[in-house]
Amino acid sequence: MFAIIGPTASGKSDLAIKLALKLNYEILSLDSLSIYKEIDIASAKPSKEELSKVKHYGVNEIYPNEKFDVMKFIEIYKKIPHKNIIIVGGTGFYLKAMLEGISQMPEITDEIKKKAKQKDYAFFESVDPDFASKISPNDTYRIQKGLEIYFATKTPPSVYFKNNPPKPVLPDIPIFEIAVDRSVLRERIKKRTDKMFNSGLIDEVAYLEKKYRDRRLPALKAIGIKEVLDYFNGKYTLKTLKEKIITNTARLAKRQQTFNKTQFKKKISAPLEELEEIILSEIK
């Protein structure tokens, strides 16, 4: 088992499929958009033909109106009957969480969620000043999660996490990174965006909006989808729409490269054209 990381549009999926066919491995995708059914073009997920050649886990698992977090990927991983797999995806956060582990969370009922929403940062600070000092007063997501733990366990989150330390899900596996120059990556992003439009991106987003009728869904806020929805509202021309998707994707890729650089110290980095040979020599 090993992982391939790299920014969006760097060629991870194609490389993983080539290696999986050579090694007789299967693939676990840690992609926050490919996990959804019905989002085929905006996610740039492998084609039906590619999915038929190599078994993929983490692709087409849930519908766009279903929620998921890292626990979903952990659940998928634990159900894989063997470990001859290549873990691949631009969302390095999920890989890091699985390598370092996450604490077992208490059961959070709708009543607890409602109770937590009624409280603010000042209340959170009064019940757990240590934990509150580490987050911004504007970080409503983490405040909400912290309060949910407090109300579910009657324990401050800092104490709860101390008593429930994270347990790694993945072993210490080899990590290979696709090293790619930003200018080259931007050109790859441009080509991929053109391909998306030629494949019917606008029709796909129109279908998603018509079926789910809720632009607040996390899936419909993804790059490539949210811009098309704005285009429907008359915010962009078609040309501006393409440019906006390219720019936003390039910004995402930059953040992913920074994350991978700072969070995965023990990795082998090489250009795409060299990495296949390096991986084969390391794995075999």
From Swiss-Prot:
The protein's name in its UniProt record: tRNA dimethylallyltransferase
InterPro entries: Dimethylallyltransferase (IPR039657), IPT (IPR018022), P-loop_NTPase (IPR027417)
Task performed by this protein: Catalyzes the transfer of a dimethylallyl group onto the adenine at position 37 in tRNAs that read codons beginning with uridine, leading to the formation of N6-(dimethylallyl)adenosine (i(6)A).
Site residues, Interaction with substrate tRNA: 91
A single MF term (Gene Ontology): tRNA dimethylallyltransferase activity
Gene name per UniProt: miaA
Transport as UniProt keyword: no
Subunit structure: Monomer.
Domain of life: Bacteria
UniProt keyword list: ATP-binding, Magnesium, Nucleotide-binding, Transferase, tRNA processing
EC number: 2.5.1.75
Residues that hold ATP according to the record: 6-13
Listed GO biological process terms: tRNA modification
Lineage per the UniProt record: Bacteria, Pseudomonadati, Campylobacterota, Epsilonproteobacteria, Nautiliales
Cofactor list: Mg(2+)
